[in-house]
Design a protein with these regions (language model features):
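Short N-terminal strand-loop motif that marks the start
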Residues: 1-64, 68, 335-340
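A glycine-/small-residue-rich N-terminal strand-loop-strand element
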Residues: 72-96
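A generic structural signal for residues embedded in beta-strands
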Residues: 32, 94-95, 148
Length: 340
């Protein structure tokens, strides 16, 4: 039996590897065949380009190979003798496991995709748990103004979650006109270009004069955080959801944070609880469950976020397009359905 997987062999060199695979299972393991697999462009391109701060536990610069990918949907092919939660034919989320065609996973590492949620939607579940965390940590109150800065996959999901949480108005900003239009279609009340000369004044005007009470910062750039500090309301909260990997500018902490009572909240997914959820801090699996409920009910829409589906056989070309194109696709799925 063979398994195929995506590998970053070196900086800016992505390849598809095929090698032997042993499908035999331990009693608590599940054999899963991948169906669809979402590329997390921010994280994966940071690793592809060998940027700093790609690992919260240390500096990985210059260290290859790397195994990208962590948001997969698949179906159960067989189960070990002690498995009780899954059976052959079940559709499942496979988190933190790379872009690959086959998996052997302990049953407590998987999550069931219910009927009414497609495999393409299910492939978004793990990545969607990141903006769930970023929005939950803000603990948005009904009627609070919210800004989502940066409209990649995470930001466009965060726009919908901020709206569902009772934020009003919900503002969104991004350089891309196409993404601003999509944010409006998905529920944003206003969408702005942060390069506009009167951007700060517009944001404040649209939120009653003071600025938004809560900001989901997903640009990944320190300049985006600086801008948020200039338009946020006094006593406001900023959730750092995007990974700001390069600290390339000073911030006047006294003027923009200390003196105005601003809360800066780290919202990296590694900061969530492992076992029990509590207000503002939910486990991954509880966020997966909420994602499934909202998608199934039609109140969270991730279908418009996927605008390209490709074969893993196109791995080198896909990462070159994502890494170097001036207008890269928003959401890219690997389609593993024709791999044996």
């Amino acid at each position: 039996m063979k398994v195929s997987y995506v590998l970053f062999e070196a900086k800016e060199k992505a390849v598809l590897i095929t090698e032997d695979f042993d499908p035999s299972l331990q009693p608590n393991e599940v054999l899963v065949k991948a169906d669809y697999d979402l590329i997390s462009a921010g994280t994966e391109l940071a690793n592809y380009h060998d940027l700093p701060n790609t690992n919260v536990f240390g500096d990985d610069r210059g260290i290859y190979p790397r195994w990208p990918g962590y948001s997969v949907s698949g179906h159960v092919v067989s189960v070990g003798s002690a498995v009780t939660k899954f059976k052959a034919g079940d559709n499942v989320v496979v988190p933190w496991s790379g872009h690959r065609s086959w998996f052997k996973k302990e049953e407590d590492k998987l999550f069931l995709i219910p009927e009414g949620v497609s495999q393409q939607e299910g492939a978004v579940a793990h990545l969607a748990s990141f903006p769930f965390l970023g929005v939950r940590k803000l603990q948005i109150q009904l009627g609070e103004g919210v800004m989502v800065a940066g409209l990649g996959l995470l930001g466009l999901i965060a726009v919908q979650l901020a709206k569902l949480s009772g934020g009003y108005p919900v503002l969104a900003c991004d350089f891309s006109e196409e993404r601003r239009k999509l944010a409006l279609e998905l529920g944003a009340d206003h969408a702005l270009d942060p390069r506009e000369p009167d951007f700060i004044e517009k944001v404040k005007s649209l939120t009653g004069g003071n600025g938004p009470n809560a900001v989901v910062e997903v640009t990944g750039y320190l300049s985006g955080l600086q801008q948020a500090l200039e338009y946020i309301a006094p006593m406001g909260r900023i959730s750092i959801l995007g990974c700001t990997r390069i600290s390339d500018a000073p911030i006047n902490v006294y003027r923009y944070i200390h003196g105005r009572g601003i809360q800066i909240i780290g919202a990296h997914t590694m900061t969530r609880p492992k076992q029990e959820s509590h207000p503002g801090y939910w486990t991954e699996k509880d966020d997966y469950a909420t994602f499934m409920k909202l998608v199934k009910a039609g109140v969270l829409n991730v279908k418009p976020l996927i605008n390209k589906i490709v074969s893993p056989r196109q791995t080198p070309e896909v990462y070159k397009e994502l890494g170097f194109s001036k207008q890269p696709p928003l959401g890219v799925l690997f389609d593993w359905t024709d791999f044996e």
